[in-house]
Amino acid sequence: MKMDHILVRYGELALKGKNRGHFEKLLLANIRHVLKPFPKVQAKRTFGRIVVELNSTDHEPVAAALANVFGIQSYSLALRVENELEAMQKGALFMLTQHPDAKTFKVSARRAYKLFPIDSQSLNHKIGSYVLKAFTGELAVDVHHPDVNVVVDVRESGTYITAGVYAGAKGLPVGSSGKVLHLLSGGIDSPVAAHMLMGRGAEVEMLHFHSPPYTNERAKQKVIDLTRELTKFGRTITLHFVPFTDIQTHIHKEVPSSYEMTIMRRMMLRIADRIARERGILAISNGESLGQVASQTLASMNTINEMTNLPVLRPLLAMDKETTIAYAKRIGTYETSILPYEDCCTIFLPTDSKTKPKRDRSAHFEQYVQVEEKCREAIAGIESLEVTGAHTSPTLDQLF
């Protein structure tokens, strides 16, 4: 015998009423995306859950991939047997042998297939008695707090036997809450913010500003690698590279150093706003944390936000750096984030940035920056990639 299936249970999406079918289809598509490295594995939607058929594939890497998918409340390794009492008894016994340290157990039979002639209570008794006899005193029944709960789920297509529940990523399926344009730097914070948004069902498109030759190809590859790391949580991610050298050098030359960072951030948000509108995206997001640096004070955010009337989402707003670092380590982005390659936010870094920049002063300094011309040139030079877990490729629909 071999555990040949994984049963996937839904989280919040089960509460979505009339939209449940749409959410289930999204979750199934996201599951199939993360299972692409396993060509024999199939995922199907059936009887209120998703069943993953392993087809002789080792269950451990498949289960590890499923553990990252948002929208999964929990999952269980399962043995499928025919709808026959003897097969159920032997299957339950096999599943208990996978828990050698267990001292107590219970059997929980669920007879969804009502034409099966033995009712649930009788199944509990017949299967439990068989297991007790086989273990000859090594196991005891505990119906309240068992070490192992053997669930026998009788369906028309067969009986699925499980003996353990593993926590999923929970949340909502990526893509179920719409699309967000996320400003991705090469640092620790922004990948964490993107992950948090994905957990609430947002599909993220990444926007990165790079400034060659001040930022090199290794810095660019670092951003691709961070994006690729995030694809394991649901789906392919579109990544846009915006050429920012000309804008940045122009600002450095024409704007007082105390306002340099503010004007740079305003230009970034202007460009992000235009890209988002072009692509039908309803919100912009970033990895800012309140008070962390000069550009992330309330006054700075207020002045910078003037460049868009789209919502600017900041999932990390109230998180401290230590918490964010721990989060980055947990999701696997930390080691890439700390690679020592500069991004555009670390070059020409002024030491006297205003913590309370004014909107009118910012607008005054922007008169010397040729805002419209520079924005158009930057958008015209965008490079877009589709990033998957395996590779990247140019986007098929070139919008810029």
From Swiss-Prot:
UniProt pathway annotation: Cofactor biosynthesis; thiamine diphosphate biosynthesis
EC number(s) from the headed UniProt entry: 2.8.1.4
Gene3D superfamilies: 3.30.2130.30, HUPs (3.40.50.620)
Pfam families in alphabetical order: ThiI, ThiI_fer, THUMP
InterPro entries cross-referenced by the UniProt entry: Rossmann-like_a/b/a_fold, ThiI_AANH, ThiI_fer, ThiI_N, THUMP_dom, THUMP_ThiI, tRNA_STrfase, tRNA_sulfurtransferase_ThiI
Binding site for ATP: L183, L184, H208, F209, R265, G287, Q296
Major place of residence: cytoplasm
Location in or out of the cell: Cytoplasm
GO BP field: thiamine biosynthetic process; thiamine diphosphate biosynthetic process; thiazole biosynthetic process; tRNA 4-thiouridine biosynthesis
Gene Ontology molecular function: ATP binding; CCA tRNA nucleotidyltransferase activity; tRNA binding; tRNA-uracil-4 sulfurtransferase activity
Record keyword Isomerase present: no
Annotated keywords: ATP-binding, Cytoplasm, Nucleotide-binding, RNA-binding, Thiamine biosynthesis, Transferase, tRNA-binding
One GO cellular component, as annotated: cytosol
Known catalytic reactions: [ThiI sulfur-carrier protein]-S-sulfanyl-L-cysteine + a uridine in tRNA + 2 reduced [2Fe-2S]-[ferredoxin] + ATP + H(+) = [ThiI sulfur-carrier protein]-L-cysteine + a 4-thiouridine in tRNA + 2 oxidized [2Fe-2S]-[ferredoxin] + AMP + diphosphate; [ThiS sulfur-carrier protein]-C-terminal Gly-Gly-AMP + S-sulfanyl-L-cysteinyl-[cysteine desulfurase] + AH2 = [ThiS sulfur-carrier protein]-C-terminal-Gly-aminoethanethioate + L-cysteinyl-[cysteine desulfurase] + A + AMP + 2 H(+)
Highest rank taxon of the organism: Bacteria
THUMP domain residues: 60-165
Job description of the protein: Catalyzes the ATP-dependent transfer of a sulfur to tRNA to produce 4-thiouridine in position 8 of tRNAs, which functions as a near-UV photosensor. Also catalyzes the transfer of sulfur to the sulfur carrier protein ThiS, forming ThiS-thiocarboxylate. This is a step in the synthesis of thiazole, in the thiamine biosynthesis pathway. The sulfur is donated as persulfide by IscS.
Family: Belongs to the ThiI family.
PANTHER family xrefs: TRNA SULFURTRANSFERASE
Protein name in the entry: Probable tRNA sulfurtransferase
Organism: Shouchella clausii (strain KSM-K16)
Gene that encodes the chain: thiI
